[in-house]
Swiss-Prot record:
It comes from Drosophila melanogaster (Fruit fly). One of its GO terms (molecular function) is rRNA (adenine-N6-)-methyltransferase activity. The gene is Mettl5. It is found in: Cytoplasm. GO terms for biological process: rRNA methylation. Keywords: Cytoplasm, Methyltransferase, S-adenosyl-L-methionine, Transferase. This is rRNA N(6)-adenosine-methyltransferase Mettl5. It is an enzyme of class 2 (transferase). Its EC number is 2.1.1.-.
Length: 213
C-alpha cells in the first residue's frame, strides 16, 4: 500500500463518505479526493513525511486526509475532530475500508496546546477552517497548534490572499514555510447561503519545516 500511485490513491479516496449535514459554524467543507491525494502523494514522494511516520490530522472531519496518509503507509495516523457526527463517519470509513493504524480522537483542536499530544507527531497535516465566515483567524490558530504538535513538518491549506502574513507568523513560531502549490479549491454549494452550485477559491498548499528559527 505504501507505494500507491497518485491516480490509484485518488480512486480509493473517492469511496470516503463525507459530511451528511455540514455545520456552518465549524466551516465543514470536505477536502476533495483529488486535492487530498495530491497533498499526501507530494508529502511522501518529495519529503518522505508519511511512510513509517506518526501523523496527526487536525480538524480531520470525516477522515479524508487521515485515510490518505494511512494508505501511503503511515505507522499511525490520529485525527482530531470536535464534531461527534464527523467522528462517527470517520470511524465508519475506517471500518468500511478495513484500515489499520488510524484513529480519531474527539477533541477541540484549540485545546491541544499543553496536552500530551505536544511533539507527539513526525508530521501534521490539515485542511483548517479558513476563518472566512464566523471564525476569523481560525486557520492561524490551527497552524499554531500544529507547529506545537509536530517534530518534523506541518502541511496545511490557506487562502492565497494571506500568504505574506502566514510566512511572517510561521517564522515567529519557529518554522520556515514554503508554498508547495497554488490550488483552485472547489467548494460545493453545501449551505443555503451559497447562491452558486459551486465556487472556486484560491488556496496555497504549504509545507512548514519545524525548528528553523
Amino acid at each position: 500500500m505504501a507505494r500507491l500511485k497518485l491516480r490509484k490513491l485518488e480512486e480509493y479516496l473517492q469511496g470516503v463518505d463525507g459530511f451528511e449535514q455540514p455545520k456552518i459554524l465549524l466551516e465543514q467543507y470536505p477536502t476533495p479526493p483529488h486535492i487530498a491525494a495530491c497533498m499526501a502523494h507530494h508529502m511522501q514522494s518529495q519529503h518522505e513525511d508519511i511512510e513509517g511516520k506518526l501523523v496527526g490530522d487536525l480538524g480531520c472531519g470525516c477522515g479524508m486526509l487521515s485515510i490518505a496518509s494511512t494508505l501511503l503507509g503511515a505507522q499511525l495516523t490520529v485525527g482530531f475532530e470536535l464534531d461527534g457526527d464527523a467522528v462517527d463517519t470517520f470511524r465508519g470509513n475506517v471500518v468500511e475500508m478495513e484500515l489499520p493504524n488510524v484513529d480519531c480522537v474527539r477533541a477541540d483542536v484549540l485545546q491541544l496546546i499543553g496536552s500530551k499530544w505536544e511533539k507527539s507527531f513526525d508530521t501534521v497535516l490539515m485542511n483548517p477552517p479558513f476563518g472566512t465566515k464566523h471564525n476569523a483567524g481560525m486557520d492561524m490558530r490551527f497552524l499554531e497548534v500544529a507547529l506545537r504538535l509536530a517534530n518534523r513538518a506541518v502541511y496545511s491549506l490557506h487562502k492565497t490572499s494571506t500568504r505574506s502574513y502566514i510566512q511572517k507568523k510561521a517564522l515567529e513560531w519557529g518554522a520556515r514555510g514554503s508554498v508547495v502549490a497554488e490550488l483552485r479549491y472547489n467548494i460545493d454549494a453545501s449551505y443555503k447561503f451559497h447562491k452558486q452550485k459551486s465556487k472556486d477559491i484560491e488556496v496555497d498548499f504549504w509545507r512548514f519545516e519545524i525548528g528553523t528559527e
